[in-house]
């Protein structure tokens, strides 16, 4: 069966950037990577506990003792809390986990319907509230298309509707060009914990092409270019002699060379006839 590569990893440094930005000695790589995992896990656990939508967590390190955590959310005021109470709690929690100074920043998502992770989180929450998955997916699809999304695909997998056998259900509208690297594809994944088991939710959004087609507008012109009639006629008249042989340089020296070659062949033929 065909498998799909993650749209982010395929487009790194084309129209996507790394979610962890740091560079240290390779001996420290595993330790810092584990710290990044702890920071993301504890932050998501805390914010999900107070029921806030989080799209992404970006980690930036300039030195070993200071970590900057950027949280993307459509409701920054709620995440910050009253006088920054929630940020202070998150900072204290992460400091205990990684024993480093934590600087937390909030990034607002102005258009939540254009964020695949936010859409996936919303669908997962409604599935946990026993909403009909068919109506839910179709309504989410229509609402995203009405906002200006060029393409959307939603797929849910698991024991849908309490069925004994797990299956998948998918809806799609518009274009999702996964093989086009210049396409701005947003991807989100969430899990709905129902009484029948876990249901996975995947969302793909196509927001348009970031790199214009005019950049590669001349691609293929050399292959598809056909010689003009003037060039063909000039080649036929000037580059082929009377006996159908190609002339590399149409000058006096070349013509004399061809005439000498033809005379030598005729002399050799006449000599063989006389010997017979």
Swiss-Prot record:
InterPro entries associated with the record: KH_dom, KH_dom-like_a/b, KH_dom_type_2, KH_sf_prok-type, Ribosomal_S3_C_sf, Ribosomal_uS3_bac-typ, Ribosomal_uS3_C, Ribosomal_uS3_CS
GO MF term (any one): mRNA binding
Family, similarity comment: Belongs to the universal ribosomal protein uS3 family.
Keyword Magnesium among UniProt keywords: no
Protein name in the entry: Small ribosomal subunit protein uS3
NCBIfam families membership: rpsC_bact
Statement: the UniProt record of this protein carries the keyword rRNA-binding: yes
Keywords: Ribonucleoprotein, Ribosomal protein, RNA-binding, rRNA-binding
High-level lineage: Bacteria, Pseudomonadati, Spirochaetota, Spirochaetia, Spirochaetales
Gene Ontology process terms (BP): translation
Organism: Borrelia duttonii (strain Ly)
Function: Binds the lower part of the 30S subunit head. Binds mRNA in the 70S ribosome, positioning it for translation.
Quaternary data: Part of the 30S ribosomal subunit. Forms a tight complex with proteins S10 and S14.
Cellular component GO terms, alphabetical: cytosolic small ribosomal subunit
Primary gene name: rpsC
Location of the KH type-2 domain: 39-110
């Amino acid at each position: 069966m065909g498998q799909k590569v993650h749209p982010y990893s395929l487009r790194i440094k084309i129209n996507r950037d790394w979610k962890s930005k740091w560079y240290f000695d390779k001996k420290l790589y595993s330790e810092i990577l584990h710290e990044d995992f702890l920071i993301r896990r504890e932050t998501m656990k805390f914010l999900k506990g107070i029921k806030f939508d989080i799209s992404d967590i970006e980690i930036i390190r300039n030195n070993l003792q200071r970590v900057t955590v950027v949280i993307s959310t459509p409701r920054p005021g709620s995440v910050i809390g009253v006088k920054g109470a929630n940020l202070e709690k998150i900072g204290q929690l992460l400091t205990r986990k990684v024993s480093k100074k934590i600087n937390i920043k909030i990034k607002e998502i102005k258009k939540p319907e254009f964020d695949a992770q936010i859409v996936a989180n919303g669908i997962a929450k409604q599935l946990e509230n026993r909403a009909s998955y068919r109506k839910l997916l179709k309504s989410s699809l229509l609402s995203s298309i009405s906002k200006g999304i060029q393409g959307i695909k939603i797929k849910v997998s698991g024991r849908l509707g309490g069925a004994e056998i797990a299956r998948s259900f998918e809806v799609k509208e518009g274009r999702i060009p996964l093989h086009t690297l210049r396409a701005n594809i947003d991807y989100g994944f969430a899990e709905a914990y129902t009484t029948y088991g876990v249901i996975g939710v995947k969302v793909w959004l196509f927001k348009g092409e970031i790199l214009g087609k005019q950049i590669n507008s001349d691609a293929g012109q050399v292959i598809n270019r056909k010689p003009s009639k003037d060039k063909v006629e000039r080649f036929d008249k000037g580059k082929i002699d009377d006996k159908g042989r190609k002339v590399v340089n149409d000058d006096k020296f070349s013509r004399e060379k061809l005439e000498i070659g033809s005379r030598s062949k005729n002399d050799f033929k006449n000599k063989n006839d006389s010997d017979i």
